[in-house]
Regions:
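Conserved beta-strand positions in the central sheet of alpha/beta enzyme cores
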Residues: 33, 66, 102, 140, ...
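Active-site-proximal loop/turn and secondary-structure-junction residues that shape catalytic pockets
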Residues: 9-11, 36-38, 70-73, 105-109, ...
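The substrate-binding groove and active-site-proximal loops of carbohydrate-active enzymes
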Residues: 71-79, 227-230
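Catalytic-core regions built around general acid/base machinery
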Residues: 48-60, 124-131, 186, 238-242
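Histidine-acidic metal/acid-base catalytic patches
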Residues: 1-4, 9, 14-28, 58-61, ...
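N-terminal-biased segments
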Residues: 5-18, 35-50, 81-86
């Protein structure tokens, strides 16, 4: 397993992609998970500079692990526009040399779907996968509240319903724990589809609401309860023991303040634990 940082951690800071790449390299990250908004802006407005940074990434054996975006598959959406956005993401993914696109399976809880609604969402997800498949690109659905992948049973059912070789999972361990499932058991049951992990933690279940999108994306949103991996309620020592021998990236998804300081310390803690395993 390798570690990547998320550019979304720097969503409210004035920091260049150049600085992020250098920071990642200096602190032992092997990849960068690129927020879709950042990817689009770099391609449209800073193409020449970014091309140099992409070359720098290669030289330092770093990579863009995934583009994390949001594809609207709601029945009220203009699905043609969603498919056009998928075409744009193919261009971006090729440019950044990645073959993974993260999105969400809708915007409401799995229990709130009628049988017919679910069928229509399944068909839309399959169509999106069909668009990316000729480019050898994978769609990764994130395990997340208020989506069709908000519980382990619904996630497994959705994978079976869509039944597409280019549909995969980004396993967010905090959110699968939030659903009431055991994170390690979830890993084993979803393992055939997993292509990426999200690592983050919280001090108490009382503060899980701080990860709701409207709060996360607000510059003045609450960050109470957001804590480093090994200081929270989810047991990451146990999780890492299970997943460390896999070939996937784990992104440290830090949404709180002082992103550079926290990410630097997280990598030190992860490195120390790795050294302890090797020496024991």
């Amino acid at each position: 397993m390798k570690y990547s940082l998320c550019t979304i951690s720097f969503r409210h800071q004035l920091i260049s992609f150049t600085d992020i790449v250098q920071f990642a390299y200096e602190n032992g990250f092997e990849g960068i998970e690129l927020w879709g908004t950042h990817a689009q802006n770099l391609y449209m407005q800073e193409r020449e500079t970014t091309e140099r940074e992409i070359d720098y990434l290669k030289d330092k054996n770093l990579e863009v692990t995934m583009i994390s975006d949001y594809l609207d598959i709601s029945l009220l959406a203009d699905f043609q526009k969603t498919m056009e956005k998928c075409e744009q993401l193919v261009t971006l993914a090729n440019w950044f040399n990645t073959n993974k696109i993260r999105t969400f399976a809708g915007q409401k809880g799995s229990e709130d779907f009628s049988e017919q609604e679910r069928k229509e969402y399944v068909e839309r997800i399959r169509m999106i996968c069909d668009l990316f498949a000729p480019h050898n690109m994978y769609i990764l659905l994130e395990t997340h509240p208020n989506t069709l992948t908000d519980t382990l049973p619904s996630t497994l059912k959705l994978l079976e319903e869509v039944n597409h070789p280019y549909l995969k999972i980004n396993l967010d361990f905090l959110h699968i724990w939030e659903s009431g499932a055991d994170p390690v058991d979830s890993f084993h049951r979803l393992k055939p589809w997993i292509q990426h992990y999200h690592f983050k933690n919280i001090s108490s279940a009382d503060y899980l609401h701080v990860f709701e999108p409207n709060n996360v994306y607000a510059a003045a949103g609450s960050r109470i309860g957001m804590v480093p991996l090994f200081e929270g309620i989810v047991n990451y020592d146990e999780i890492i023991r299970e997943v460390r021998d896999t070939d996937h990236f784990a992104s440290l998804e830090w949404f709180g303040h002082n992103a550079k300081d926290i990410l630097k310390e997280e990598m030190k803690a992860l490195t120390n634990r790795k050294l302890e395993v090797v020496s024991s």
